[in-house]
Regions:
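HIT superfamily nucleotide-processing domains
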Residues: 1-111
Length: 111
């Protein structure tokens, strides 16, 4: 998508602090971290949000990436995955992305 910041990051047009990349996904540190370990896991193919995804294998792959990145960051013993969907769900960028949060004790409910 032409004006999508995550599409531009995925294509390399905009730099990011990458922690993972393959042909389907990229993971990079969030610019406004909410935890010591806060990484965004983003499919390279543009989907506005999770309701647009019709590829179960891709969603499974994104979960595997999350697990791998959590291990890489040393937070596999405790982390949270969050997918905000739509404006009311707190989605700020209209490109599906998964927040991986860890590195400290996380509270529940989150808000």
């Amino acid at each position: 998508m032409e004006n999508c910041i995550f599409c531009k990051i995925a294509s390399g047009e905009i730099p990011s602090k990458k922690v993972y990349e393959d042909d389907k996904a990229i993971a990079f540190y969030d610019l406004e971290p909410q935890a010591p370990g806060h990484v965004l896991i983003v499919p390279k193919k543009h989907y506005d949000n999770v309701t647009m995804v019709d590829d179960g294998a891709l969603m499974g792959h994104l979960m595997q990436v999350a697990s791998s990145v959590a291990e890489q960051l040393g937070i596999k013993a405790g982390f949270r995955l969050v997918i905000n969907t739509g404006k009311d769900g707190g989605q700020s960028v209209n490109h599906l992305h998964i927040h991986l949060l860890g590195g400290r004790e996380l509270q529940w409910p989150p808000g």
